[in-house]
Amino acid sequence: MNKINIKKVVLAYSGGLDTSIIVKWLQDTYRCEVVTFTADIGQGEEVELARTKAKAAGVKEVYIENLREEFVRDFVFPMFRANAIYEGEYLLGTSIARPLISKRLVEIAHQEDADAISHGATGKGNDQVRFELNAYALDADIQVIAPWREWDLSSRESLMDYAQKHGIEIDYKKQLKKSPYSMDANLLHISYEGGILEDPWAEPEEDMWRWTVSPENAPNKAEYVEITFKKGGIIAINGKTMSPASVMEDLNKRAGAHGIGRNDIVENRFVGMKSRGCYETPAGTVMLKAHRAMESLTLDQAAAHLKDELMPKYAEMVYNGFWFAPERKMLQAAIDNTQEIVNGIVRLKFYKGNVTVVGRQSKDSLFSEKIATFEDDEGAYNQKDAAGFIKLNALRLRLKALK
């Protein structure tokens, strides 16, 4: 990349140690103006502090945007309509946040007539891939600066030394006492990596978990919750209509209080290595269970089974950074077509780390009590018909058995 041609850069900025250093590094290395962008997607931090820190670093244009509703409505909910889960365990909390941030980075770059965008993802992880693939899908000519792939800073200590040397304001005592884990949070989840988690045999300390109580210490009384779906999306909890972001906030609080949503995973990163992460996804755990329950009542068998076959590929696309790719959009269109009839109410029980479906109802239900009953069905189903069905399906098996 020709540094001479870089006059203005839009940086995805959190206000933390890494991105605070990146501001100064970009200014010194590229001799460019830096515009910062901070997305509020429910990370639970005081995002306005990012404005103060950016201004102190000499940033003139600071973008701080509340994207909570857009994040859930246009990214989280569509993903959950697919029942997406990566490698059978991961609910994609970090993965699904990256497309929206990339989208706004590109849009702000266009608005500011910037020459490049930049992010603080390391050269070892998935996020660098996600940020950049999503950005290139929206602007083929966008230039991306990834400082972690260029500079020689390789540890927290080296970052702190750089900050001290260049007069970057950070709370050194806070940094030294900082959690040993690398954390990332939004309305869908909070993740933990690093520290003792780098040993896959080591159990995380109880005080690591921030959103959920230990199931052992959860209430001894179960809580019943009714979730209302319309076209595959949650629109109400216990009869109270809520916005998408409010749904997430409510379920995170309710489910977290019962110890629901903890997960400890070793996953295969897109870049090739295995990585261990711990996740708290209270609302997502509930949503997946409830949505599958609603689909079990309303979706045709073959459509439901085909959807399940497509889901791992969909989840892989999200995980790897292909949200804006044509194949993900194609699958989304097919999935959303199935959701027109996913309407109704699911009743759940929360108790000591478990979420159990205890009831479901829908005006679009395909369940026929008259046909399914073990009692007299008054001729609704002729059991004699099953003989021919079995005989035809057994044909290839019988032919094989004759050999």
Swiss-Prot record:
List localization entries.
Answer: Cytoplasm
InterPro entries, per database record? Arginosuc_syn_C (IPR048268), Arginosuc_syn_N (IPR048267), Arginosuc_synth (IPR001518), Arginosuc_synth_CS (IPR018223), Arginosuc_synth_type_1_subfam (IPR023434), AS_cat/multimer_dom_body (IPR024074), Rossmann-like_a/b/a_fold (IPR014729)
BP term (GO), one: argininosuccinate metabolic process
> What are its GO cellular component terms?
cytoplasm
Q: Which residues are noted in the entry as L-aspartate-binding? A: T122, N126, D127
Q: Which reaction does it catalyse?
A: L-citrulline + L-aspartate + ATP = 2-(N(omega)-L-arginino)succinate + AMP + diphosphate + H(+)
What EC number(s) does this enzyme carry? 6.3.4.5
Name a Pfam family for this protein: Arginosuc_syn_C
Q: Is Cell wall biogenesis/degradation set as a keyword in this record? A: no
Query: Which UniProt keywords are listed?
Result: Amino-acid biosynthesis, Arginine biosynthesis, ATP-binding, Cytoplasm, Ligase, Nucleotide-binding
GO molecular function, a single term = argininosuccinate synthase activity
* Pathway assigned to this chain's UniProt record: Amino-acid biosynthesis; L-arginine biosynthesis; L-arginine from L-ornithine and carbamoyl phosphate: step 2/3
Q: Where does L-citrulline bind?
A: Y90, S95, N126, R130, S182, S191, E267, Y279
Family classification: Belongs to the argininosuccinate synthase family. Type 1 subfamily.
> Subunit structure, per the record?
Homotetramer.
| Name of protein | Argininosuccinate synthase
